[in-house]
């Protein structure tokens, strides 16, 4: 009976709850009562021993008396596994924290391999590894080393031309009509470019022109190129041919592309080669003589453009006089 009580638990078992403890019926009442009393005394003694043993082995101070805490081996294993898992997570977190600076350094090293192309005028600061001094270099020097003879040269600002008109159109055309190479016909859809190199003895270029009956487009540009001859030449081209020629010049300059920058070079270099003195506009050259002058900005070739590309029906007779002064 003591084994059964221990299995059921000493705290939940009560002798008054068992059947037959209150006495029987008939002749068996006395015998059953004495047996019940003996059983009750024995159970009380067993309960006292079990309570003393439970109080000695129970580590929890707040557990109620006579109710020992039963801990299964499975719960102990689960607690131990939880502690191990927590320790492993903490170790992984520490490892990640240790590796984070190294990863960041590796990313920065990879980013440093890709250098951003410097534009003209940017400043490059170089830290010396030996003395700690800071050297300031212009990016133009690096561009010059990379481009060589094809480096981009920013042209100086063009001074505005001096222009005027006068009304003696008939006298002007009559005089130039008798001179050689002072009269030409600009056909419909054509553009005539008169190339005038700078002269070693001159300081400015001057021009005068007039037309018969109709106006014409006129503009002046400057080509920053070395002068090999002082001869004035006339170039006649169709409007489409003129555009194709400009594209060919762009392609020729596109060949020496700066290393590391595929978007720089040709077109910007072409713009840097030609300076605009005055844009092409339609001039009333059939009413007044159009005249002007421009001081030499340096060595190069003036491009005087007479544009009749907008006219699809009429040719224009042009009278012109171009010279230099000191």
Swiss-Prot record:
<dbReference type="Pfam" id="PF13897">
    <property type="entry name" value="GOLD_2"/>
</dbReference>
<dbReference type="InterPro" id="IPR009038">
    <property type="entry name" value="GOLD_dom"/>
</dbReference>
<feature type="domain" description="GOLD">
    <location>
        <begin position="160"/>
        <end position="324"/>
    </location>
</feature>
<dbReference type="InterPro" id="IPR052269">
    <property type="entry name" value="Golgi-PI4KB_interaction"/>
</dbReference>
<feature type="region of interest" description="Disordered">
    <location>
        <begin position="1"/>
        <end position="80"/>
    </location>
</feature>
<feature type="compositionally biased region" description="Acidic residues">
    <location>
        <begin position="239"/>
        <end position="255"/>
    </location>
</feature>
<feature type="region of interest" description="Disordered">
    <location>
        <begin position="238"/>
        <end position="268"/>
    </location>
</feature>
<keyword id="KW-0007">Acetylation</keyword>
<feature type="modified residue" description="N6-acetyllysine">
    <location>
        <position position="170"/>
    </location>
</feature>
<dbReference type="InterPro" id="IPR036598">
    <property type="entry name" value="GOLD_dom_sf"/>
</dbReference>
<protein>
    <recommendedName>
        <fullName>Protein TMED8</fullName>
    </recommendedName>
</protein>
